A protein has these predicted regions:
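Substrate-binding pocket helix/loop in short-chain dehydrogenase/reductase
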Residues: 114-116, 123-128, 233-234
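Short, small/polar-rich loop/turn modules that mediate ligand/substrate recognition or access, typified
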Residues: 192, 197, 263-265
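The beta1-alpha1 cofactor-binding region of Rossmann-like NAD(H)/NADP(H)-dependent oxidoreductases
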Residues: 55-59, 77-89, 121, 247
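Residue(s) in the substrate-gating loop at a strand-loop-helix junction
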Residues: 160
Length: 277
C-alpha cells in the first residue's frame, strides 16, 4: 500500500456502485491517493434508466470510499462530452487539492447492442461522444496542467478487448475503443517529452451493473439465460472466469505508479488470456 501516496487522481464515470470507476477510485485511495470522482449525475436522466448514476449515487460512492479508506474523496458532476464541464472539473480539482497527477478516462457507454444496419445515427454519435470525445477533452485540458506543474503525469484510458478484436453488433462501441487506442498512442508520442505517460487498459467482460445489462441483452439475442451467457464467456477465457472490477483497478494502479514509469503508449490486456495481442 502507499504507491500513490499524496498523488491526486481524477476518475471519470465513477458514480455507480459496483462500477469500474468506483473500483478504480477505491484502489487509488487505498494506495494513498486523494481522489476526485465524476459522473454525469441527474442531467444523465435522459439516458436509459439504471445506466447513469444520479448525483446522490455519486456522493454515495464518495462516502463509501471515504468510509473504508479514510482518504480525501471529492465528487463532481461532469458531462465528459462538454468541454466547459471538463475544464471546470480540472480547474476545481487543482484549486481544491493543489495539484493533479493522474487522469483515468473511465466514463463510457456500451449498452446498445445492434447490427450495423439497425444502428441509428444518434446511437452511433452518443457512443463516440462519450467514449472518444470525452477522453480527448480530458487529455487536451489535463496535459497543460501536467506540463505547468513540471513533474509529469499519467493518463489512463479504459478501453476494451473490443479495441483489438471485432465485436459483432457493437460497431459503434468497438470503433470508439479502437479510436481510443489511437488517441492513447498519439498522445503518448506527443507528451512523452514532458514526462507524461499515456496508456490504455483493455478489459474483457466485467460483470458490473452495466455488464449485467449487457448479459441480459446478449441472452435475448443468443436465446439463453444470463447464466448461459456467462458460461459461454468463460469458455473462451483460458483462466476460466470473467473479469473482476479489481483486475482492472489493479492494472490502473500499476500504470499510475512509479513501477510503470517507463511504460507509455501501451494497451494492456486484462482479459484472463481471452485477448492476446
Amino acid at each position: 500500500m502507499g504507491r500513490l501516496r499524496e498523488k491526486v487522481a481524477l476518475i471519470t464515470g465513477a458514480g455507480r456502485h459496483r462500477g469500474l470507476g468506483e473500483g478504480i477510485a477505491k484502489r487509488f485511495a487505498e494506495e494513498g491517493a486523494k481522489v476526485v470522482i465524476t459522473d454525469i449525475g441527474n442531467p444523465g436522466k435522459n439516458l436509459p434508466a439504471g445506466l447513469i448514476g444520479t448525483t446522490e449515487e455519486l456522493e454515495g460512492v464518495a462516502n463509501g470510499i471515504r468510509g473504508v479508506t479514510n482518504s480525501t474523496v471529492l465528487s463532481m458532476i461532469c458531462d465528459v462530452r462538454s468541454e466547459s464541464d471538463v475544464k471546470s472539473v480540472i480547474g476545481a480539482t487543482v484549486k481544491e487539492l493543489g495539484r493533479l497527477d493522474i487522469v483515468v478516462n473511465n466514463a463510457g457507454i456500451g449498452y446498445i447492442i445492434k447490427p450495423i444496419t439497425e444502428l441509428t445515427l444518434d446511437e452511433w454519435d452518443i457512443v463516440l461522444e462519450v467514449n472518444l470525445r470525452g477522453p480527448f477533452l480530458f487529455t487536451k485540458h489535463a496535459a497543460p496542467v501536467f506540463i505547468k506543474q513540471g513533474w509529469g503525469g499519467h493518463i489512463i484510458n479504459i478501453a476494451s478487448q473490443a479495441a483489438k478484436s471485432p465485436a459483432p453488433q457493437l460497431a459503434h462501441y468497438s470503433s470508439s475503443k479502437h479510436g481510443l487506442i489511437g488517441l492513447t498512442r498519439t498522445a503518448a508520442a506527443e507528451l512523452g517529452n514532458h514526462g507524461i505517460t499515456v496508456n490504455a487498459v483493455c478489459p474483457n467482460h466485467v460483470t458490473t451493473g452495466l455488464g449485467e445489462v449487457q448479459n441480459q441483452r446478449r441472452g435475448e439475442i443468443m436465446g439463453m439465460d444470463v447464466s448461459g451467457v456467462l458460461d459461454f464467456r468463460k469458455s473462451k477465457i483460458p483462466l476460466g472466469r470473467v473479469g473482476l472490477v479489481t483486475d482492472t483497478a489493479n492494472a490502473c494502479v500499476f500504470l499510475a505508479s512509479a513501477d510503470a514509469a517507463y511504460i507509455t503508449g501501451e494497451s494492456l490486456n486484462v482479459s484472463g488470456g481471452e485477448e492476446m495481442h
